[in-house]
Every structure is written in C-alpha cells, then in structure tokens.
C-alpha cells in the first residue's frame, strides 16, 4: 500500500474547515448581503461607465492563485478596491444604455436560493420541483401576456405547447430554428439543407445570424430585408412576400421568419399579424422575438403589439431585461413542443428512468442545447409572488412615464429632435443639423455625415463624464442617441438630471464649434 505525499497532509491542515460549513456560510453570507446592500445604497455615487483602461486588472492582481486560504474580509476589500472600479454599473439609476438589466430584491434572493440549492435539473427525476415549478411559472407568465392556450401546458394534454426557460434570446432562437430546420428537412430530405432560407428585417437582433450559421444555413440564404422610416423601421409584409416569391422562383425553400417586437436599435415593432399571414402561405416557422418589449405586454395598453401571436410558432422575451429578474432568464414558448424535442433530445442509458419512460413528465434537457440546466424558475417565481401582477405593471408604467418625461424635455429644446417615435421606455434623439451648422452653407452630402460625427462626439463627452451612460444606434444612415429608461432605482429626478447633463455638454460642444463648422 502506498502513502499520501506529505504535501497533501499540509494542504489539508491549511484549510480544515468544510467548504460548506453551515455556520461559516451564515457568517460570510451575512457579510455579502451587507456588502451588496451598501453597494446599492451608494451606487449612484460611482461613475456609471467604468473609467479604467484595458488591462487594468492584470496590473493589480497577483500572477497566480494563492497557496494559502484568504479571508472573506480580505477578498471583499479587493472587490471594493479592484473590481468595483472596473464595473459599468448597470443597476445605477443613471444607467440609460443598451437595454435595462433590471434587478430586484426578489430576483437577487431567488438567484440565491437557486444557487444555494445548486441542483442540476436536466430531467424531471434529477429535481422534480425544478421542472414542475418551471412549467407552472411559464404558464403564469403566459397567462399574464394572454398568450393563446396553444402556447401553454394543458392539464389534459390537449395542447402540444408549453414554455421553457433558456439562458438568452440567442439560445431561444437557435433552439426554434433547429426545430424548424429538422421539421422541414424531414419533408424535403437532409440533402437540401443548402436550399433553406431564413428571413428577418435589417433591424433584427444579430443573434439570429449567428444561430443560422450554427444551424448550418447557407450564409447566402440568411436574408435581412431592408426597412425604412416610412414603416418606422418595421418589416413590411409586402417586402417579405416579394422576397419569398423570388426565392421560391430560384428553387429555394423558405424556412424561418424572426419578427421583432421592440428592436434593439429603435424599439421598432414588426406587424405580427400581417407577417404571419404571409409566412403561413409558404409554411414558414414564425418566431416572435420580444426580448425587451415583451415584458410591457402584461399591461393591457401594450398588449396589442403582439396581436397576431396566435399565428406564430414560438415567442420569447427576456425576463432579465425589463422584468426585474436577474440574468439569465429568457422565457420561450412554443406551440409544437414535439418538434423541439425531436430536434434536441438525447437518450443516453445513464439518464433513462421510469418517470421519463412513462411520458408523463417533462425532461427540459430536450428543450434546450445543453444537458445541464440551472434552476432559473426559482427567481422568476419569487419575482411574480413578491410583487404581483399589479405592482409589476406599475413598475413598467413608471418607466414609460419617465421616458415620456424625457421626450417632453427634448421637445422644449429646439436644438434636438426625436429620430423615431417612442413606443415603450426608450427615446432616440439627436442634435439637429440646423443646430450644428446654423447659417453656414454646407454641401448636402456632407450634412448627415458631419451631423452624425457631432452627435457621436456629444455622446462620448456625456459618457466620459461618468454622470450618466447612454449608447447609440444608426438607422437609415442617421446616428442617434438611445436613452433607455429601465433601471429599477431610476426616478424622475434622475431623468431630469440626465437631460441637464446632455444640455451642458451640448453647450460646450456647440460653443467649441463656433464659426468653424463647415
């Protein structure tokens, strides 16, 4: 018999405490909660966008991991001194960039419960509560959105639909595209995969293109159909129909359409009903991506934006964007779960069990790409229970109200203009050419380019101040500044203050331009 090397005994003596000692977990856990509570109490004081340079952290941290244990107190000191300065503070009330990643006490504590239990719910048997809670909360949220019953689980099995929690929209789109692909190839033969065509607008999330690549779609057959200001950058059903007919004439096979409710660039809304009508003429799978704006559709006044969803095949929204649930939590509903399962299921011997064989349970591993899966439903359950439908609607409406307030402030300053209509809680605006060029005579083809350049300088100046953070988009060749309200801590005073910051930096930039603009 051999013996353990001496250094093994040395390592054991250095850390004799069990890594899951309940008393130590309680002590350190309280410290972390206090630390985060203090962070949120003071988050408004930090520069919203990080001020560090690339590679800053490598200069601060050791080149190798510690040999001996370090205390949680020391680690938290390093978090304060080294990590927080390198964070962009998405939960700051002065964060108006990208789309929100709205947090909440219920979301954080639900995440804590999920992580604390640390179960791996790939099938029903591996943790029945994780599977069953997920199917329940997906039905709850589907009912809040008044989704058709065909998208929900039914107790009598009359519906073939249901919901699943994915990590992100990227995963949801890839899963549905894979299901659509296999369903079509079973009809026309797998040798015809290069004929399959995927459709979207030029405003659709870039994740669709990545999903198409992964799913083996010929890159030439990924078609981003042009939109215009005439339709507020929504996809035209006529443009879709003419594109499809041209493809059929060329011997291609229309497969998949991704329509969007609330595009990333401008929150444009594709006309769901008319697009579905066109798609169904050609047997196309329709996925509705409502990653951002879907949450608002629990409010009756916004529900009409998803009218026509009954004719779609799948629908998704990100609860981690504007529904007070921590990343990651993408809600996906499908009408035909069998197609999803057929495309994604595996059945290795070591996962076989009586519950699965009975066909009376859901094995969510067959509804997603990965095998392992997190207990995401716990945090969504806590959010739904802790706030209730009434309060969730109130929170969402307050963000829309603040966006309207910001829009009103823009309207009172004739140097600015709204570029696209505000639909939800994001305002897209820019400095007008007239404010930049004043009475200078400028070549028409230079006006937009120089206007875009000045607006880009304005945005960078504002963001560099650290007082607020916004991002930009370009639609129809126009550079615009996006002001997205949605951080949980944001109040009207923050919106008013943000506008004052924009005006101050505008004054400085226009003053510097002086009479030199040409």
UniProtKB/Swiss-Prot annotation:
GO terms for molecular function: 5-hydroxy-L-tryptophan decarboxylase activity; L-dopa decarboxylase activity; pyridoxal phosphate binding; tyrosine decarboxylase activity. It comes from the Eukaryota. Signal peptide: none annotated. It catalyses: L-tyrosine + H(+) = tyramine + CO2; L-dopa + H(+) = dopamine + CO2; 5-hydroxy-L-tryptophan + H(+) = serotonin + CO2. The gene is TYDC1. The keyword Lyase applies. Predominantly expressed in the roots. The lineage of its organism: Eukaryota, Viridiplantae, Streptophyta, Embryophyta, Tracheophyta. It is an enzyme of class 4 (lyase). Homodimer. Marginally higher substrate specificity for L-DOPA over L-tyrosine. GO terms for biological process: amino acid metabolic process; carboxylic acid metabolic process. Keywords: Decarboxylase, Lyase, Pyridoxal phosphate. InterPro entries: Aromatic_deC, PyrdxlP-dep_de-COase, PyrdxlP-dep_Trfase, PyrdxlP-dep_Trfase_major, PyrdxlP-dep_Trfase_small, Pyridoxal-P_BS. One of its GO terms (cellular component) is cytoplasm. Belongs to the group II decarboxylase family. This is Tyrosine/DOPA decarboxylase 1. Its EC number is 4.1.1.28, 4.1.1.25. Transmembrane segments: none annotated. The modification N6-(pyridoxal phosphate)lysine is found at residue 321. Its cofactor is pyridoxal 5'-phosphate. Pfam families: Pyridoxal_deC (PF00282).
């Amino acid at each position: 018999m051999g013996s353990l090397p001496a250094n093994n005994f040395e390592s054991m003596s250095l850390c004799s405490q069990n890594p899951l000692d309940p008393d130590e977990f309680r002590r350190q856990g309280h410290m972390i909660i206090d630390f985060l509570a203090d962070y949120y109490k003071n988050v408004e004081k930090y520069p919203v966008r990080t001020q560090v340079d690339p590679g800053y952290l490598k200069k601060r941290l050791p080149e190798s991991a510690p040999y001996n244990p370090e205390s949680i107190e020391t680690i938290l000191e390093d978090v304060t001194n080294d990590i927080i300065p390198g964070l962009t503070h998405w939960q700051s009330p002065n964060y108006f960039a990208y789309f929100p990643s709205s947090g909440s006490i219920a979301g954080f504590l639900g995440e804590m419960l999920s992580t604390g239990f640390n179960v791996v719910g790939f099938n029903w048997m591996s943790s029945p509560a994780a599977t069953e809670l997920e199917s329940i909360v997906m039905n709850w949220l589907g009912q809040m959105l008044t989704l058709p019953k065909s998208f929900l689980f039914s107790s009598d099995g009359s519906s073939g639909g249901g919901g699943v929690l994915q990590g992100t929209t990227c995963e949801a789109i890839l899963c549905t595209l894979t299901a659509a692909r296999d369903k079509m190839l079973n009809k026309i033969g797998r040798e015809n995969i290069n004929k399959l065509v995927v459709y979207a607008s030029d405003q659709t999330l870039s994740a669709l293109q990545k999903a198409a690549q992964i799913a083996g779609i010929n890159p030439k057959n990924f078609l981003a159909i042009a939109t215009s200001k005439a339709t507020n950058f929504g996809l035209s059903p006529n443009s879709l129909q003419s594109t499809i007919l041209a493809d059929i004439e060329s011997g291609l096979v229309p497969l998949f359409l991704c329509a969007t409710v609330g595009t990333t660039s401008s929150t444009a809304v594709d006309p769901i009903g008319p697009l579905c009508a066109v798609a169904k003429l050609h047997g196309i799978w329709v996925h509705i991506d409502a990653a951002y704006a879907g949450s608002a559709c629990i409010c009756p006044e916004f529900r009409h934006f998803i009218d026509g969803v009954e004719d779609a095949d799948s629908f998704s929204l990100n609860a981690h964007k504007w529904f007070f649930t921590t990343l990651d939590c993408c809600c996906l509903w499908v009408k035909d779960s069998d197609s999803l399962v057929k495309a994604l299921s595996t059945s290795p011997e070591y996962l076989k069990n009586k519950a699965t064989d009975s066909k009376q349970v859901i094995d969510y591993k067959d509804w997603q790409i990965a095998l392992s899966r997190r207990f995401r439903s716990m945090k969504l359950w806590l959010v739904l229970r802790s706030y209730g439908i009434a309060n969730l609607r109130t929170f969402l409406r307050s963000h829309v109200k603040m966006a309207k307030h910001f829009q009103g402030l823009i309207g009172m300053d004739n140097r600015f203009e709204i570029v696209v209509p505000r639909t939800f809680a994001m305002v897209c605006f820019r400095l007008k050419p007239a404010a930049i060029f004043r009475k200078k005579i400028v070549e028409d083809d230079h006006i937009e380019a120089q206007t875009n350049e000045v607006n880009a300088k304005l945005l960078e100046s504002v963001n560099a101040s650290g007082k607020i953070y916004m991002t930009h988009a370009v639609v129809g060749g126009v550079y615009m500044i996006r002001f997205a309200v949605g951080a949980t801590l944001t109040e009207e005073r923050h919106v008013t203050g943000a506008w004052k910051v924009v005006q101050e930096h505008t004054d400085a930039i226009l003053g510097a331009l002086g009479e030199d603009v040409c």
